[in-house]
């Protein structure tokens, strides 16, 4: 947790002091005794995590056993820490069950998903007036957030730079459905009071959005102090300079928890099929009246979605965006399958090499 110094004493204490801790987590942790303490990951570095324990904020490594099975703690995770300060050792040995996961498609050729934050109740999708406002990008974010299990809220920042912000709010609302859209200025603190219903004590809120939309300024305004460096606005492209380098967790004065995520540079979909359906609910609703159950809504006869587009009920660009995201999801799935097959092939190849080495060493070749 930001603004805490590492305590010299043991991290043992009242578990309820860990933000977001509840009875379900207490039950999950009850099997651990002795030097094991619960904690919550506040920020993640390459090989260590900053972990909020009941009575201290410490740096803890990640056990080899966790790494071997591919379990990686992320910001927001509730974890089990083997706390042995007298030996100079603190190690994350397990991750308690996650109630929500914010994921995205992993970068690179292997496909798959990358979890970037966990145990989030609400996600603020932050955009800004000017060139950053992109409805297609917001649709992507909505699909990702819906898939996480968290509640989405869209924040339109920098309204002080816009003559008619209500027009932009209506534009965003046209693709957001029932998702709240809140106009504000983090710099002048205009409209921040509208965030109160979404910042409840003990709940966790994460901020996502592209670089330069003002997330750091928003955090500073909500905390009432400068804890995140901001980069100002470049006049040539109306964007703030990208400044956040690691995810961090902050405790607001009312007891709500705020997680800041760096601007997602590669907004790829993970396993977001359900999220896409929720983000494009009007298309899914219309599809229930299609002639064919496996209709792709491209050129099939009797397609109710294409009819809705023709009748002006569904905007053509919405359907085009839906197709782009579903095509991308299918591509990601194929890429992931290819990656798994490659790993399986490499595993069998290694087994064959090991068998050959064994036979050679025992003279059975």
From Swiss-Prot:
Subcellular localization(s) per the UniProt record: Cytoplasm
GO molecular function terms attached to this record: GTP binding; GTPase activity; metal ion binding; rRNA binding
Binding site for Zn(2+): 290, 295, 297, 303
All residue ranges annotated as the CP-type G domain in the record: 112-267
Enzyme Commission number, as recorded: 3.6.1.-
Coiled-coil region(s): none
Cofactor: record remark: Binds 1 zinc ion per subunit.
Broad class of enzyme this protein falls into: hydrolase
Cofactor: Zn(2+)
GO biological process, one term: ribosomal small subunit biogenesis
Binding site for GTP: 157-160, 209-217
Domain of life according to the entry: Archaea
GO cellular component: cytoplasm
Alphabetized UniProt keyword annotations: Cytoplasm, GTP-binding, Hydrolase, Metal-binding, Nucleotide-binding, Ribosome biogenesis, RNA-binding, rRNA-binding, Zinc
Family statement: Belongs to the TRAFAC class YlqF/YawG GTPase family. RsgA subfamily.
Assembly and oligomerization: Monomer. Associates with 30S ribosomal subunit, binds 16S rRNA.
Role played: One of several proteins that assist in the late maturation steps of the functional core of the 30S ribosomal subunit. Helps release RbfA from mature subunits. May play a role in the assembly of ribosomal proteins into the subunit. Circularly permuted GTPase that catalyzes slow GTP hydrolysis, GTPase activity is stimulated by the 30S ribosomal subunit.
PANTHER family for the chain: SMALL RIBOSOMAL SUBUNIT BIOGENESIS GTPASE RSGA (PTHR32120:SF10)
Name by which UniProt lists this protein: Small ribosomal subunit biogenesis GTPase RsgA
Source organism (scientific name): Methanosarcina mazei (strain ATCC BAA-159 / DSM 3647 / Goe1 / Go1 / JCM 11833 / OCM 88)
Taxonomic lineage from the root: Archaea, Methanobacteriati, Methanobacteriota, Stenosarchaea group, Methanomicrobia
């Amino acid at each position: 947790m930001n603004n805490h110094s590492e305590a010299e004493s043991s991290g043992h204490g009242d578990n309820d002091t860990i933000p977001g801790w509840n009875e379900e987590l207490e039950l999950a942790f009850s099997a651990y005794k002795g030097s094991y303490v619960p904690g919550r990951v506040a920020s993640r570095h390459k090989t260590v995590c900053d972990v909020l324990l009941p009575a201290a904020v410490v740096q803890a490594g990640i056990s080899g056993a966790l790494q071997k099975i591919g379990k990686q703690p992320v910001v927001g995770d509730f974890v089990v820490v083997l706390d042995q300060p007298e030996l100079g050792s603190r190690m994350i040995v397990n991750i308690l069950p996650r109630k929500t996961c914010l994921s995205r498609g992993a970068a690179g050729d292997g496909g798959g998903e990358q979890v970037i934050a966990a145990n989030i109740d609400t996600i603020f999708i932050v955009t800004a007036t000017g060139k950053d406002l992109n409805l297609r990008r917001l649709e992507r974010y909505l699909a990702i957030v819906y898939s996480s299990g968290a509640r989405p809220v869209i924040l339109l920042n920098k309204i002080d730079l816009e003559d008619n912000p209500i027009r932009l709010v209506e534009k965003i609302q046209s693709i957001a459905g029932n998702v709240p859209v809140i106009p504000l200025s983090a710099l002048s603190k205009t409209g921040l009071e509208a965030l109160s219903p979404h910042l409840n004590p003990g709940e966790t809120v994460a901020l996502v959005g592209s670089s330069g939309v003002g997330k750091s300024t928003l955090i500073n305004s909500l905390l009432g102090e400068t804890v995140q460096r901001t980069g100002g606005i470049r006049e040539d492209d109306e964007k703030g300079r990208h400044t956040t380098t690691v995810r961090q967790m902050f405790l607001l004065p009312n007891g709500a928890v705020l997680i800041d995520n760096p601007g997602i540079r590669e907004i790829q979909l993970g396993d977001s099929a359900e999220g896409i359906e929720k983000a494009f609910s009007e298309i899914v609703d219309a599809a229930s009246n299609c002639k064919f159950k496996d209709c792709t809504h491209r050129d099939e006869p009797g397609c109710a979605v294409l009819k809705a587009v023709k009748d002006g009920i569904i905007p053509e660009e919405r359907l085009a965006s839906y197709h782009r995201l579903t095509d991308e999801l299918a591509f990601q799935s194929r890429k992931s399958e290819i990656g798994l097959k490659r790993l399986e092939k490499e595993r069998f190849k290694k087994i064959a090499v090991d068998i050959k080495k064994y036979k050679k060493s025992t003279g059975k070749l």
